[in-house]
Amino acid sequence: MGSVDPSRLSLVLFARLSGLVVAVSVLYWALFLPNLGLSYSTLHPLLMVIGFILVSGEAILIHRWLPGSRKTKKAVHLWLQGMALASAVFGIWTKFHYQRGVFANFYSLHSWMGLLSVSLFAAQWVTGFMSFWHRGEVRTTRTTFLPWHVFLGLYTYGLAIATAETGLLEKLTFLQTKRNVPRRGSESMTVNGLGLGLALLGCIVITAAILPKYQSHSRDEKLVYSSQDRPKCLSS
């Protein structure tokens, strides 16, 4: 069991602070500014931003700060990603239920990017479970798939944030043109601040995931792990 390097917690702390700003912003925007309360229209941004983006970001950071065995980290990572996937699916369902139709919703770049990001996330979760949790896969297969799992996970996370940004722009454009929301009003400023917070959050989470300084295992631990799990060759 490796100890947590205090220097590694700096980016995690910044990620938590930016995530808190994002959560407060989307809650304030969805529940208080339109004066609609909790409804299907307000559930969509809440589930997609807090349930999908924030929870999946926390799942990525699990490997950077959580002390314990690799099995414990993988289990927490798996369950958090499963929660994020469930929130994303439910968030899409609320949009369909609110607009009364499936095909009527798929007309914009935001809708197509959302479908792509959730589909990739679901495929990533299933393949990750089969490769790293299910014991049927051989060690060499998991080792080969690991770089692709990391890359596709970060790509999908970035795509989800980009999708949220297009959704914010689409919604703000509608509010300003159809409902005469002031460009410098509180709602416009809140949406713009939410977009900046999401961009900052994505940058911090991805940086913490790819920088060697913030990886959870030391070099000596990796060498021991590699020597123990290296497949043996049978001589003929």
From Swiss-Prot:
Q: Where does heme b 2 bind?
A: 77, 149
Reaction(s) catalysed by this chain's protein: Fe(3+)(out) + L-ascorbate(in) = monodehydro-L-ascorbate radical(in) + Fe(2+)(out) + H(+)
- Name the Gene Ontology molecular function terms of this record: metal ion binding; transmembrane ascorbate ferrireductase activity
Cofactor section: heme b
Highest taxon above the source species? Eukaryota
* Localisation per UniProt entry: Membrane
Q: Which SMART domains match?
A: B561
Record's keyword annotation contains Iron = yes
Q: Which UniProt keywords apply?
A: Electron transport, Heme, Iron, Membrane, Metal-binding, Translocase, Transmembrane, Transmembrane helix, Transport
Note on cofactor:
Binds 2 heme b groups non-covalently.
Q: Name one GO cellular component term.
A: membrane
Q: Which Gene3D superfamilies match?
A: 1.20.120.1770
User: Taking every annotated instance into account, which residue ranges of this chain make up the domain Cytochrome b561?
Assistant: 14-210
PANTHER family annotated for this entry? CYTOCHROME B561-RELATED (PTHR10106), TRANSMEMBRANE ASCORBATE FERRIREDUCTASE 4-RELATED (PTHR10106:SF41)
Q: How does it assemble?
A: Homodimer.
What this protein is called in its record is Probable transmembrane ascorbate ferrireductase 4
